[in-house]
A protein has these predicted regions:
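Inter-domain linker/hinge segments that demarcate the starts of reverse transcriptase
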Residues: 10-22, 50, 147-162, 219-224
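Basic, alpha-helical interaction scaffolds
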Residues: 187-262, 266, 277-280, 309-316
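Catalytic palm subdomain of template-directed nucleic-acid polymerases
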Residues: 38-54, 132-160, 177-178, 207
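Active-site palm subdomain of RNA-directed nucleic acid polymerases
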Residues: 23, 104-135
Length: 316
């Protein structure tokens, strides 16, 4: 099953806005929201109202109501179970329906923030961005403090209705553009000076540090995978397959978001072909290796082609 492109798009858009606020000298504040036990606290009554609001169909509403009505649970501890007690909040872990119900619920928050004229996002290339979401990961972009205050009021009201509460002490914030050197730490949030992770990728103004943090860890993981397979006895086709399916796959998400320098491209290529040729000198030219089999090649992975294809596929 192919992975969803949405985490790639969310992180890519945030990184793009981060870079443009610096280049165009646009002030702003980025908030990485943290909800307290998000999937465990959302109210069932709120979910039912959301389903009715989006009009998903009477049949689906009835099925969901059946799954989330008059539910009781018991806790098993050291072989002893407690009395049954009623449940009225939270979506079930492991249930394939749970992510969709949660996403529908938090979509109301996104709609409210986008429609509120007092909440001003960051406008770049005539496009204003206020909020980006993936599951319970929510990023807010504001261009002034008053806008942040208004957004927090909306979050409080949403929490009163839905049960989702903002954890201010774990919410992280970042000054953007000309404010990036500001030392103030308002609103009770964390204001880290080091690069922060958003959806498994580091995001920061320092391009070199950003590249180092994101790519070096992936390269180390790729090398560790190759080390495990080095003791196997495979054909040249097998080595190429492992390099492509297990090794270079480690870089897909990061390459989709960030630009990779020529130095790292050379490092990746060197690592791949050293693995294929068992640390010996290349016996076949690499341009031949990456060609299709009907052209005399082995379809070995090409990091250059991968970079171009990923940028073409995911560039928002």
């Amino acid at each position: 099953m192919p992975r969803s492109p949405f985490p790639v798009l969310v992180t890519s858009v945030n990184q793009r806005y981060l870079e443009q606020t610096k280049h165009q000298d646009i002030p702003g504040i980025l908030l990485q929201l943290d909800f307290q036990r998000a999937f465990d606290t959302i109210e069932w009554k709120f979910i039912q109202n959301v389903i009715a609001f989006f009009n998903v169909g009477e049949s689906i509403q009835q099925w969901i109501s059946t799954f989330y009505s008059n539910i009781q649970s018991s806790v098993l501890n050291n072989g002893f179970s407690t009395n049954y007690f009623a449940l009225s909040r939270g979506v079930r872990q492991g249930c394939p329906l749970s992510p969709f119900l949660f996403v529908l619920a938090v979509e109301l928050l996104a709609c409210k923030i986008r429609q509120d004229k007092e909440i001003q996002g960051i406008k770049i290339f005539r496009k204003e961005l206020k909020i980006s979401q993936f599951a319970d990961d929510t990023i807010l972009l504001n261009n002034n403090r008053n806008s942040v205050g208004r957004a927090l009021n909306v979050l409080d009201n949403f929490g009163n209705l839905s049960g989702l509460r903002l954890n201010s002490s774990k919410t992280k914030a970042l000054w953007l553009g000309p404010w990036r050197h500001c030392k103030e730490t308002p609103f009770g949030f964390q204001w880290p000076e080091k690069p922060e992770r958003i959806l498994a990728s580091y995001v920061s103004y320092d391009v070199k540090q950003n590249e180092k943090l994101n790519f070096e860890t992936k390269l180390q993981k790729m090398q560790s995978i190759f080390d495990v397979w080095n003791c196997r006895n495979l054909t040249i086709f097998g080595w190429c397959l492992i390099a492509k399916s297990l090794g270079i796959a480690q870089l897909v998400h990061t390459i989709s978001i960030l630009n990779i320098s020529k130095a790292y491209i050379r490092t990746v290529n060197s690592t791949i072909f050293k693995f294929i040729w068992k640390n010996e000198k290349d016996k076949i030219k690499r341009r031949v290796m990456i060609s299709d089999c009907d052209e005399g090649g082995l379809r070995a992975p090409s990091i250059e082609i991968m970079v171009k294809s990923m940028k073409l596929a995911w560039d928002p």
